[in-house]
Swiss-Prot record:
It comes from Drosophila melanogaster. Keywords: Cell cycle, Cell division, Cytoplasm, Cytoskeleton, Meiosis, Mitosis, Repeat. Residues 581-814 are annotated as: TOG 3. The lineage of its organism: Eukaryota, Metazoa, Ecdysozoa, Arthropoda, Hexapoda. The TOG (tumor overexpressed gene) domains are arranged in a N-terminal pentameric array with each domain composed of six (for the most part non-canonical) HEAT repeats forming a oblong paddle-like structure. Intra-HEAT loops are positioned along a face of the TOG domain and bind to a single alpha/beta-tubulin heterodimer. The TOG domains in the array seem to be structurally and functionally polarized. Differential functions may range from microtubule (MT) lattice binding and/or free tubulin heterodimer binding to potentiating stable incorporation of tubulin into the MT lattice. Binds to the plus end of microtubules and regulates microtubule dynamics and microtubule organization. Function in neurons is essential for adult survival, and is important for climbing behavior and activity. Promotes cytoplasmic microtubule nucleation and elongation. May act as a microtubule antipause factor that rapidly catalyzes the transition from pause to either growth or shrinkage. Involved in mitotic spindle elongation. Involved in the establishment of cell polarity and mitotic spindle orientation in neuroblasts. This is Protein mini spindles. Residues 849-1087 are annotated as: TOG 4. It is found in: Cytoplasm, Cytoskeleton, Microtubule organizing center, Centrosome; Cytoplasm, Cytoskeleton, Spindle; Cytoplasm, Cytoskeleton, Microtubule organizing center; Cytoplasm, Perinuclear region. Belongs to the TOG/XMAP215 family. HEAT repeats lie at residues 120-157, 160-197, 270-311, 315-353, 357-394, 396-433, 440-478, 587-624, 625-662, 672-710, 745-782, 856-893, 896-933, 937-974, 1017-1054, 1205-1242, 1272-1309, 1311-1344, 1346-1383.
């Protein structure tokens, strides 16, 4: 048995490949377990198993194979590497699994296949399954078919492509195996379910019996709705949202109930065919034959080809289309015309969208041919024009359509109208803009009145269809002049019309998301007439809804149309709304506005109107922005109520305009509302007093809608006015708006308006317009001047002067933009945040060529001109070309539509007359310039002619052809040149001259073209010709072909070109390979292949932009390309190339080119060296920079070689050159570093390691020379270096660390720190770990000066990282920060969860044991000297030295600034020096004489009479503590509790401590120190000092107790109540309460969590938990030792929850208000129990967070009552208050909510409450409160207010009342102290201040107080410190105790336990006081409060004297006190607890 299980000791990976099948099963199961636990798909663990998955699925053992499939399924589902395994795994599944005997194995194999589909590997899965369908085993075939069917059923046809499956149906259906046939049938049915009837054509070849069976199955599926049941992983989240949205919408949309099959285009299932190659060679010749039968034969052949091959391959069909068009237009035989029309229809259908290039030439001819009346011809023409329309649009053919509707022939008009009607049934409404709609409607209305009834009927049908499509609202207003009879006919046609496509109509209104307000009477469901703003033409976009099977219909009036001015290119429509009727307006305005305002607006007295508008303006911001139509209601109320905006009083009008502006700024605004008032506001621009206000209103309108829309309205209305003032001011406003908003306008429209202004006769208007033109010139440049070329010279000179003012000025940045409202309306929703809102962004460059009006020269290209150009006489042809030149020159800019001119020019390009060809080339170049980008449409026709001319024998023709090609390329792009293999055809049969020129052109242009701009297939077609020409006999051809190799290699790559060599002859391979190898070094470095999860690299601009110069045209590219390819070889003889190519220059040259490179990068002239993966542009840039810097050419070639061995050679050469050429290294350092960064992205480790070794040498040289890296050098190197710090190889990581440590010495470490911080964002856990280690090193080396607080917070976030190494590194880094910053670290790290914080605390504890904190080097101050630790017998002894206590090792949270720290340490040193000089000789460093003087009157303890102790039965202490059982089984273990209570080994330790540790231990609790830290720090310090305490000997974070506490927050009420009962048993027992001391924070958090849970369930269910929960909370705060150390945040959250419960009537069930009483009692307990400082801070913080929120008023009132209660207690508890913390919290309140914020609030009571706190603190502290303002800026509101308070105190004489309450101050003032009494007390205090007489002074002071009990001594203690107060009080108390003790032997054991005596809590607290060291607390208080560096000398002397007296007193007590045994201490604790319990019971 031992041998059988031996394999379990092996790693999982080895078990998975073990020879023993049981071991493999175990390995597979363990692997599956590991896969389930991995939650990171990119975890390195996945890579260990990636290669094993394929073996798991083909395991020879059946059981192991099953387990392997289970593991593989989990792997594929969760791993990011699963995609890499699909090929091997699917092959194994198909071969071994899918037809396995075991059912589970088959099921698992199918599930794995489906999971691969889910992770988007469906192509590979289908490919393998299709291969399996060809297997010999029928079981495998049937299983593969079944799996494919299942995948198609679950994922749908969009994921599983059906095209390859349809091809397999025929063999599957005819297979001899019945199972295969049945599965094939199921697959066919499933395919039909998804694609419908489109499949039938594909299976028509099947046997009729099979077809009949399938048809029967298909009929069963009719009407079935199909949807995927499973989605790809990338779609799942999106589909879930879509499904939810669809479910919601379907509830309100009944018309979507019908199910339908999403139709698929049958053409998508076909393969395209090239029919051009199949056409007869004599086709065109036959088509020109005179005999019609021959022409018919030619067309029949074409028709057969088109019928047999419905889908056509892309190609050059221009000649075929022209031939068919010629037959249609010219042929007199109607049969041939019909055949040509049918062929044209088939051709258009076969090319689909690709026919668009030919549509414009065909449509006019077809419309014209409709004059033919033969039915067969008309039918054929209809089919043709309908097929062509699928590739074009009505807008593109509008001119031809309008012209045909004006034709004289009625048939043409009728058929054109019918064509429009048919086209509209297949057109989306959005395709018809307002201009086109108006044009069509106007033309059709004209034909509607034709005398021919056919024309009228056709026109009515077209108009009816138009109304059906667009809606009545859009079309009916354009039919106002149509008589009723014709309108009735149109309506009849509208009803009959049927839209044949799914119209993306406007989205239906759904229910409002929230209920309407109480005032608004809006219906529950929005109706069509709603005034809610909505997009005008917003289509429905429900992605989950399928297209209905039957054609959808659109009801009239369903769509609305937006004004074209409201649209911007690529923008979204503006919001509109329904115009409210006057009755509705009256009703709604009365609902929201008071009657006095409405009446005042129409009052005849202007003063009343003024008062009304003033009142309305003040209330304008208080309305509900979500109320429908609020803007329209308010604006129309102002403008619609007489006198409205016709107001004659300028003051009233000013307020009205301000109201409208405020509405536009604060509420959603639509164009409907703007249109109602904008004209009246534009008129007010001319108002002398209110013009500016009107302009502000227009600007507000522009912000709320769009600037373009408002500007259009303003200028349009201004020119309708005759007032020059209005026009002038309108131009002025537009001018200002352009500057404020940026140029967010359509320049073309604006230019037309401004030209009107420039041409105005009024000089003011003209001047304003000219000024606006000058502003426009800043945005549009000097080209704007061409629009004013036709103006008069004087006017042009004025415009030029304005242009000159703005020469060289950049447009200012926009300061205003589209308003972003949160109202939630359509007009201001995030959906409408388009580009118009980006006011702050840079304006897009304006293409002036697009703005210039273009002329359509198509009408001028007449048949006569074309005939003249094709005349046989060359002179006539030349005259025709000359006329054409004149036409183009006159038009200057033309439209791309030039009719049949392009084919005519193509014939002239190959003209036999060279002069004609040259002229034609010049015309083509002229066309490109005049046409712009549109010239690309004619490349297919003209480019073959250009290439022909490029091979002409005459050089001037070749030069003209080259210029023409370049012009077309620059204007329209080069992509079209490479399509259709035009270049390949030219190279194939061209002349040597053509080959030479064409290869030269390609060598020039190809390197500069972006890689993806040209299809690889098109370039690949040139490779065979390239190889042939490399070996051509012509030397020039060979030379230029060799030069073109690099350009082609850039696009195809070396490997692809190398593979193409296989088809070459062996004799040619050597030369071709040599050419490839020569070009290869110049090839740019390839970027890393993109992984599955890597973001795609965006396509970069052309290479010319890399150089960053101004002129980036063709010459620049040509020059650079030549330099890259040949390196000057065109000047050399090829025979001597090998010798002359050797570069003997130094590797690196010393020059000053580096400075220029740095300047270029700073000025953004070149690319910044920042990238994720190196792209080609960066490689080319670096190569060019190296060439410019004269780097050795051979070195450059090796640097950019694809083979890594060349890179190693480069590094070796550079290393050898380093020693003797360091100056050159510095000059080229940036280039070397950049090249090495490229190597960081290579995968070869040898290059990487060698490169790092070289970098170590380089930086050592730089360090020796004390060189400092430039900013550009460091920023281009360090970030890339950090990428390799997380490399898996140790050698690489170590090298990177070594280099980085060197970089710090030559580059500012602060910047290095920033780059390392950026490295934390990496997804690589190892990189994050290393970066954190480097940050630790930097912080340790350079201190906290380099580490901002935000960086510490970011580092702390890494503590919660999943990776353990990252967590440890982050913890180490924060520990280092803690050593330097102390407790301040906790504030810097921000919020951490409990788990992370506990880890950090534990790590800090451990680190402090091994390493002491060292101050950062930035503060060079000598450390304070510490005295040796002194062992004492009790913790009550103080420091025993008259110096400030040394700082606590744990530090404090709030550290003083560095300057204050320096001052404190200097003062500390002085005090230490004084102490050393005057060091007493007595014990503990005290003065023995003083000790003797103090001891002389004391009575020793052993001399006192012993008084018998009370006989108290303490047997109960030995009884076990009973724990109440609960139903949930939650309890604290009894044996553990007993062990904790009686842990004797802690009690028996020697009680020793040191002054420093004691002082540190008992320092006051900082209000900012979290309770979690207190739990760790205080017990740790107590254990270190061996101070016994019940709570301290308990375990910290006992898991069982934590489980009980966390049970309180359980959502299970039974479990929660059980946990509450368990805790109640602990809290109610005083002896057990100490257990919870360290769990207070956790307990409160869980209580709050339960409160949150209860708030979400009904009251009836929650009450049963509220009762015990509130009870235990009351008990908790009623306990003596609990609740005192809660943090500020915990108190704030608790008080918020309690006050919310009191404010919320949820718990007030019936008349019973007991719950509120209980909660009120809890609040009072909290206010009395918790730390007073933390309480005040928490309440102030809660008030700060409450005020801006919409909290219940009762909540705020309760909160302020709590604060007022604290204010009343302030004089009594002032000693407990940390003034610094409270004042800082008040400061934060005033910063967040300053006094200005309260001015607009209805009540400022909270602010006055806060000021009351300050007032009372100032009254208590007096001027001393200024000592607590260290953290408050002097310019703050708090500081100013305190100074004002103190000044008032001085005036009132109240500043002396420090430390007294107001009531006490009155009592003191009422009592007149005599001068003699005052002198007496002063003499007594002088005695106390003297060391020799202080005891005598205390006795006299006690006697004086006994004799004068009415005199308050606090008056005489004003100005002294708190420790001196405490010394006086304790001294008097000690004397009183001695007096009362009388003859008793031990006054500390004479305790009266009567009920009227002190509360037992007092004795427990006093016991705790003695245990933890009362004197230590005094020392801590002294260190916290005395502020010695701020007080005067008198107070300092008093404090120092006090220290000495404390030391003497402590020393005496310790000598006389007996040892207290641990047992006695334990029994005393238990006895006091018992007495306390009895006291409570009574």
């Amino acid at each position: 048995m031992a041998e059988d299980t031996e394999y379990k000791k092996l790693p999982v990976e080895e078990r998975c490949v073990h020879k023993l099948w049981k071991a493999r099963v175990d390995g597979y199961e363990e692997a599956a377990k590991i896969f389930r636990e991995l939650d990171d798909e990119k975890s390195p663990e996945w890579s260990k198993f990636a290669g094993l998955i394929k073996k798991m699925v083909v395991d020879s053992n059946a059981l192991a194979q099953e387990k392997g499939l289970e593991a593989a399924l989990i792997f594929v589902e969760n791993s990011g590497l699963a995609g890499r395994t699909v090929g091997d795994v699917m092959t194994g599944i198909v071969q071994k699994c899918i037809a396995a005997p075991k059912t589970k194995t088959k099921e698992l194999s199918v599930q794995v296949a489906l999971m691969y589909v889910e992770i988007e590997k469906q192509e590979a899965v289908v490919e393998e399954l299709v291969k399996g369908m060809e297997a010999k085993n029928p079981k495998i075939v049937s299983a593969c078919v079944a799996a494919t069917t299942l995948a198609l059923r679950e994922f749908g046809h969009k994921v599983i492509g059906v095209k390859p499956l349809i091809k397999k149906l025929a063999p599957l259906m005819s297979d001899r195996d019945k199972t295969v046939r049945d599965e094939g049938k199921q697959l066919a049915v499933e395919i039909y379910r998804w694609i419908g009837a489109a499949m039938k054509a594909q299976i028509s070849t099947l046997p009729q019996v099979t077809l009949k069976e399938l048809e029967d199955e298909f009929d069963k599926l009719k009407g079935e709705r199909v949807e995927p049941s499973r989605y790809l992983k990338s779609q799942q989240e999106k589909q879930a949202k879509i499904a939810d949205a669809a479910a919601t919408e379907d509830a309100y949309n009944e018309d979507d109930g019908e199910a339908g099959v999403e139709e698929i285009d049958p053409m998508d299932l076909l393969d395209p065919v090239d029919i051009l190659s199949k056409m007869p060679k004599d086709f065109y010749d036959k088509l020109e034959e005179k005999k019609w039968t021959l022409r018919k034969e030619s067309l029949e052949v074409l028709e057969k080809l088109l019928t047999d091959h419905p889908k056509l391959e892309n190609g050059e069909y221009g000649a075929l289309v022209s031939a068919l068009k010629k037959v249609i237009t010219k042929d007199s035989n109607v049969v041939l015309v019909a055949m040509a029309g049918k062929c044209l229809a088939l051709l258009a259908k076969g090319l689909a969208k690709r026919f668009s290039n030919y549509a414009s030439a065909c449509v006019p001819s077809l419309l014209e041919k409709f004059k033919e009346k033969k039915p067969n011809v008309v039918t054929a023409l209809r089919e043709a024009i309908d097929a062509i329309y699928a590739s074009t649009s009505l807008e593109a053919q509008q001119e031809s359509i309008v012209e045909s509707l004006s034709n004289k022939n009625p048939s043409v008009k009728s058929e054109t109208a019918l064509f429009i009607a048919r086209a509209l049934t297949r057109t989306q409404p959005t395709a018809l803009n307002k201009k086109l709609l108006k044009l069509l409607t106007t033309s059709l209305v004209k034909t509607l009145n034709e005398p021919d009834p056919t024309v009228r009927d056709s026109s009515a049908e077209a108009l009816g269809t138009l109304i059906k499509l667009m809606g009545d609202k859009a079309v009916t207003p354009l039919l106002a002049d149509v008589d009723p009879l014709k309108m009735a006919k149109i309506k009849e046609c509208q009803e009959k019309a049927e839209i044949k496509i799914k119209v993306a109509g406007p989205k239906k209104e759904t229910r409002p998301a929230s209920a309407p307000t109480a005032k608004a009477a809006a219906p529950a469901k929005t109706v069509a007439g709603s005034v809610d703003p909505k997009p005008v033409t917003r289509p429905a976009t429900t992605g989950a809804r399928k297209v209905l099977k039957k054609p959808a219909t659109v009801s009239g009036g369903g769509a609305t149309s937006a004004p074209t001015a409201a649209l911007k290119a690529g923008g979204k429509p503006l919001a509109t709304e329904r115009e409210i009727t006057p009755e509705e307006l009256q009703e709604k305005s009365e609902e929201i506005l008071p009657a006095e305002i409405l009446n005042g607006l129409v009052d005849s007295n202007w003063k009343n109107r003024l008062a009304a508008v003033e009142q309305l303006l003040g209330e304008i911001s208080g309305f509900d922005a979500k109320q429908a139509g609020i803007s329209q209601i308010l604006i129309r109320t102002i403008s619609g109520r007489k006198p409205g905006l016709k107001e004659m009083n300028f003051q009233v009008l000013k307020f009205k305009l301000d109201i409208i502006r405020s509405v536009a700024e604060n509420y959603p605004l639509t164009t409907t509302t703007v249109d109602l008032v904008i004209n009246e506001i534009i008129e007010k621009l001319a108002d002398a007093k209110n013009g500016a206000a009107a302009a502000d209103v227009l600007s507000a309108f522009a912000e709320a809608t769009k600037l373009e829309y408002v500007v259009g309205k303003v200028l349009s209305f201004a020119f309708e006015q005759k007032s020059p003032k209005v026009q002038s001011e309108a131009f002025n406003w537009v001018n200002r708006s352009i500057i404020e908003f940026g140029f967010q306008l359509q320049p073309k429209t604006l230019i037309e308006d401004v030209r009107k202004g420039v041409q105005s006769t009024n000089p003011t208007v003209r001047a304003s317009a000219i000024q606006m033109v000058g502003t426009m010139s800043m945005y549009m440049g000097k080209a704007l001047m061409m629009f004013f070329d036709s103006e008069k010279p004087a006017l042009k000179s004025q415009i030029q002067v304005e242009f000159d003012k703005n020469v060289g000025e950049k447009p200012p940045k926009p300061v205003r933009g589209v308003q972003r409202s949160s109202g939630g309306t359509a007009g201001n929703s995030p959906d409408n945040e388009d580009d118009d809102g980006g006011a702050a962004g840079e304006e897009e460059p304006i293409n002036m060529a697009d703005l210039l009006p273009r002329v359509d020269i198509a009408p001028q290209i007449t048949e006569a001109l074309l005939k003249e150009m094709s005349d046989k006489d060359w002179k006539t042809r030349n005259e025709g070309l000359t006329k054409l030149q004149a036409i183009i020159s006159e038009a200057r800019l033309i439209k791309p539509s030039i009719g049949d001119l392009a084919p005519a020019l193509a014939h002239r390009l190959v003209d036999s007359n060279a002069k004609i060809a040259q002229t034609t080339l010049a015309i083509c170049e002229q066309l490109a310039t005049a046409m712009g980008a549109g010239c690309r449409n004619h490349v297919r026709n003209l480019f073959p002619g250009f290439l022909h001319a490029l091979g002409d024998n005459k050089s001037f023709v070749r030069a003209a052809a080259l210029n023409c090609i370049n012009s077309f390329g620059e204007k329209g792009g080069y992509k079209e040149f490479f399509e259709s293999e035009m270049i390949a055809d030219a190279l194939k049969g061209g002349s040597p001259a053509l080959k030479t020129e064409l290869w030269a052109w390609l060598a020039d242009k190809l390197p500069g073209l972006p890689p993806k701009s040209v299809s690889k297939e098109d370039i690949h077609s040139m490779v065979p010709h390239l190889y042939a020409h490399i070996c051509d006999r012509n030397a020039d051809v060979r030379k230029n072909a060799n030069e073109a190799v690099l350009g082609i290699m850039i696009h195809l790559g070396f490997d692809a070109m190398n593979r193409a060599l296989d088809k070459q002859k062996p004799a040619s391979k050597k030369d071709i390979l040599a050419a490839l190898e020569k070009a290869r070094p110049n090839l740019p470095v390839k970027p890393l292949p993109k992984g599955k999860h890597q973001a795609p690299i965006p396509e970069e601009p052309k290479l010319k932009t890399v150089r960053g110069g101004g002129a980036g045209g063709a010459p620049g590219i040509q020059k650079s390309a030549t330099a890259r390819v040949a390196g000057g070889q065109d000047k050399q003889v090829p025979a001597r190339k090998k010798d002359e190519d050797i570069d003997t220059s130094p590797l690196l040259c010393a020059n000053s080119a580096k400075n220029q490179r740095l300047l270029d990068e700073q000025k953004m002239k070149v690319l910044k060296w920042t990238f994720v993966t190196p792209r080609e542009e960066f490689t080319e840039l670096l190569r060019d920079q190296m060439m410019t810097a004269n780097v050795n050419k051979a070195l450059i070639a090796n640097m950019f070689h694809d083979d890594f061995r060349y890179h190693l050679k480069v590094i070796e050469q550079l290393s050898e050159d380093l020693a003797g050429n360091s100056k050159a290294l510095v000059c080229n350092l940036d280039l070397i570093l950049k090249w090495l960064t490229l190597r960081f992205y290579d995968t070869n480790p040898s290059v990487l390691i060698k490169g790092l070794e070289y970098l170590v040498q380089v930086f050592q040289v730089l360090i020796d020379e004390e060189y400092i890296l430039a900013e550009n050098e460091g920023s281009s190197f360090v970030p890339h270096l950090l990428l390799k710090i997380g490399d898996p190889k140790d050698a690489v990581r170590n090298g990177v660390r070594r280099v980085l440590r060197q970089v710090i010495l030559v580059f500012p470490f602060v910047k290095v720190f920033g780059y390392v911080m950026e490295g934390l964002k990496s997804k690589n856990a190892r990189q994050r770990t290393e970066c954190l280690d480097e940050l630790t090193f930097l912080i340790e080396s350079y201190g906290m000066n380099i580490c901002p607080q935000s960086a510490v917070r970011e580092i702390a976030r890494q503590i919660s990282d999943r990776d353990n190494s990252v967590r440890n590194a982050a913890l180490n880094c924060i520990v280092q920060v803690f050593f330097l910053s102390g407790e301040k670290t906790y504030k810097m790290i921000g919020h951490l969860n409990e788990k992370d914080l506990s880890m950090l605390d534990e790590r800090i504890k451990r680190a402090k044991k091994t390493k002491k904190p060292t101050p950062p080097p930035s503060v060079d101050v000598p450390a304070p000297q510490r005295h040796d630790s002194i062992e004492i017998e009790d913790a009550e002894v103080g420091n025993g030295c008259d110096e400030l206590p040394p700082p606590d090792e744990d530090g404090t949270f709030d550290q003083a600034p560095s300057s204050q720290l320096l001052l404190l340490q200097q003062q500390l040193q002085q005090l230490q020096q004084q102490a050393q000089q005057q060091k007493p000789s007595g014990p503990f460093g005290l003065d023995s004489q003083v000790i003797s003087e103090i001891e002389k009157d004391w009575v020793r303890v052993d001399q006192m009479e012993q008084k018998p102790l009370l006989n108290v039965d303490i047997s109960s202490l030995d009884e076990p503590i009973k724990v109440r059982p609960t139903r949930a089984g939650i309890h604290y273990p009894q044996e553990k509790f007993d062990r904790l209570i009686s842990r004797q080994h802690y009690m028996q330790q020697t009680l020793t401590t040191s002054p420093s540790s004691t002082a540190g231990m008992t320092s006051g609790v900082s209000p900012y120190r979290s309770p979690m830290r207190l739990q760790h720090q205080q017990p740790q310090q107590q254990l270190e000092n061996n101070i016994p305490n019940l709570a301290d000997v308990l375990p910290k974070h006992d898991p069982q107790l934590v489980k009980v506490i966390k049970g309180v927050s359980s959502t299970d009420t039974l479990k929660a109540r059980a946990a509450i009962n368990e805790l109640a048993a602990i809290i109610e027992a005083p002896e057990k309460q100490a257990v919870l001391r360290d769990y207070e924070e956790i307990f409160i958090q869980n209580v709050l969590a339960q409160f949150k849970n209860l708030s979400q369930i009904p009251s009836a269910q929650s009450v049963v938990v509220y009762q015990p929960l509130l009870s235990i909370l009351y008990t908790f705060f009623h306990a003596n030792i609990l609740g005192k150390t809660l943090s500020v945040a915990c108190i704030k959250n608790l008080m918020s929850a309690l006050l919310n419960l009191m404010a919320d009537p949820k718990l007030a069930v019936g008349d019973d208000s007991q719950y509120n009483k209980v909660i009120n009692g809890i609040c009072l307990k909290v206010l009395d129990k918790v730390d007073f400082t933390n309480l005040n801070c928490a309440l102030i913080r809660l008030l700060r967070e409450t005020c801006p929120e919409a909290k219940l008023p009762k909540f705020t009132d309760l909160l302020m009552k709590c604060i007022w209660r604290n204010v009343k207690m302030l004089p009594e508890r002032s000693n407990e208050l940390n003034y610094d913390a409270v004042i800082l919290e008040v400061h934060e309140f005033m910063l967040a909510l300053p006094s200005t914020w309260w001015q607009n609030r209805p009540s400022d009571t909270p602010m006055r409450t806060i000021k009351t706190i300050l007032h009372n603190m100032a009254k208590v502290k007096g001027n001393a409160i200024l000592q607590h303002l260290n953290q408050i800026p002097t310019h703050s509101e708090l500081h100013t207010y305190l100074i004002r308070i103190l000044k008032n105190f001085q005036k009132d004489g109240s500043a002396s009342g420090i430390g007294a309450s107001p009531q006490r101050a009155k009592e003191i003032a009422s009592k007149r102290i005599s001068h003699q009494t005052h002198d007496t007390v002063s003499q007594i205090f002088k005695l106390i201040s003297d060391r020799d007489t202080k005891q005598q002074g205390l006795q006299k002071l006690y006697d004086f107080k006994q004799q004068n009990p009415d005199i308050d001594l606090s008056t005489f203690l004003q100005g002294s410190s708190a420790p001196f107060h405490k010394y006086i009080e304790e001294g008097l108390a000690e004397i009183e105790r001695n007096q009362n003790a009388g003859s008793t032997q031990d006054n500390r054991t004479d305790v009266n336990y009567q009920n009227n005596g002190p509360d037992p809590d007092f004795w427990m607290d006093r016991l705790q006081y003695h245990m933890t060291g009362g004197a230590a607390k005094l020392a801590s208080a002294r260190s916290a409060d005395d502020g010695s560096h701020m007080l005067d000398n008198k107070v300092v002397d008093e404090n120092l004297c006090l220290n000495g007296m404390n030391a003497q007193k402590a020393s005496l007590i310790k000598r006389e006190k007996r040892d207290m045994s641990p047992n006695r201490l334990q029994h005393l604790q238990a006895k006091l607890a018992q007495i306390k319990k009895e006291n409570h019971a009574q």
